[in-house]
Structures are given as C-alpha cells and as structure tokens.
Amino acid sequence: RNEGGEDFLYVTAYQRQRSFAKLTATGETVWRKYAPMEAGGYADGEDVLPRQDNPWGRDRFMPTNFAFHPDGGFFLADGYGSYRIHRYDADGNWLSCFGSPSGPEKSGGAFNLPHGIWIDDTGDAPKVVVADRANGRLQWFSLDGEYLSELDGLLLPANVDVRDDLLLVPDLVGRVTLLNAAHEVVGHLGDDSARMNADGKKAIRRDESLWINGKFVHPHDACFDGEGNIYVAEWVQRGRITKLRRLT
C-alpha cells in the first residue's frame, strides 16, 4: 500500500509464526503484531512466540489476508484460525471483529475458512468482500461489519481483487472467475475445473507433465496490475505464476 508517497508491504504468516507485519519496500520491519487477545476466543498463550508446536483450531490465530480500509486502517482475515475478520487502525491497534465459524446451514455472516478479503468499491459505497472458501461463496459486509449479501455457486474462492467494475476471484479448483459490478459472472479464465474435480488424489498438482498451458490447476491468488493484466499464483508442486495480458 502507498502511504504518503511511500510503498509498504503488509504480510501474514500462519503455522508457527502466527503473526502479521508491516514492512518497507526494502524489507525492513515497521511493526509486527500477534494474536489480538483482547478480541476474546483465543487459547491462552496464542500471542506468545516463538513456538515449536503447531496446533490448529478455531481458538488459534492463523491470519491469511489483508484489505485496506479507506480511513487508513485495515481488515485482517483470520482465515485458518478463528474464522473471524479483525479490524485495526493505521498503527496496527485492534479495534473490533466480526464473523464466526459457520454450521451446515451456512448462515450469512458466518464463515468456513475465510481465506481472502478485499474492499469492493464497484458500487455506490465501499464494502468488505470476503472469500468464504470452504462454503464456496463470497460475502459482502459494510465497513462496520454488517452482513449485506452473498454470492453462491463458486468452487473454492481463495481471494478477491478489484479493478474498475470487475472483481477477480481465483477459484482453487482450476479456474479464475470474473464478476461485474452487479456480481454476475462474466467469464471463467483457464477453466479446467472438471479435470481438477475428478483428480481426487491431487496427482495433477504434483506432476508438471499433466499441466496444460492456458489451463489452471490450483490458483491460490490472483491480482490485477496497473494496466489491467492479471497475475495468477498457483499452489502446485514447485509453484507457478501466470500472466494474462489484457487485450482490450
């Protein structure tokens, strides 16, 4: 994010690191933060590092992604941990949170692995959009965390990016989806989802000889650049980055 003419990196780390940090563009640490114990719900000692164990669960802190609030603060998705969205001020001080683990009824405002998050400014007012991955949907919230709407029918949406009136959604099961400002699907890029769904043992992810140029295997993230090109990062055996060049 550019702040006062200077670029900064915001990074998350889960597993044994269980923290998030703000870095300069050259990699120097501005600050590093740990589990927001004031939010409640976390196991005792979850904010204490280093650690050698690696327990998982809804009482753990395993952050996955950021979204930047228009006021200079940010939202943080605890995507592998408590399944909540935390809000912080510009200095990394915890303010509030919303969301909870969902049950089989998949009620609005509850999550099952909220891996990705971004600010959707395609409408009249900016909204928080959450990639509710294991529930196969996107959910929209006000900047205060009030549930607004959702879109079902995705596979395993991992994150979201926005450019002009388009939303970009990497779907882990072999495709990247584009939505318009009305949240309607306008296209699936590199769609190989049928082959990925049939690969129950995930052999394709491990065997590069089975990858097909122009088709995606396991897109874990995607973003637009300043010219509207798309970059897709895939979680495969040795990793793969694909650039899709904007044509019009």
Predicted regions and their residues:
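Beta-rich, blade/repeat-based domains predominating
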Residues: 1-7, 42-73, 103-126, 135-136, ...
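Blade-level signature of beta-propeller repeat domains, shared across WD40, Kelch, NHL, RCC1
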Residues: 215-248
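Short loop/turn segments that connect beta-strands within beta-propeller blades
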Residues: 24-26, 89-93, 142-146, 180-184, ...
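Loop/turn-rich, solvent-exposed surfaces of beta-rich toroidal or solenoidal domains
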Residues: 124-131, 151-195, 199-201
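Short loop/turn segments immediately following the C-termini of beta-strands
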Residues: 14-15, 79-80, 122, 133, ...
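Surface-exposed loop and turn segments in beta-propeller and other repeat-based domains
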Residues: 28-61, 93-112, 186-214
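Conserved beta-propeller blade signature
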Residues: 8-11, 73-77, 127-130, 166-169, ...
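WD40 beta-propeller blade core
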Residues: 21, 84-86, 96, 139, ...
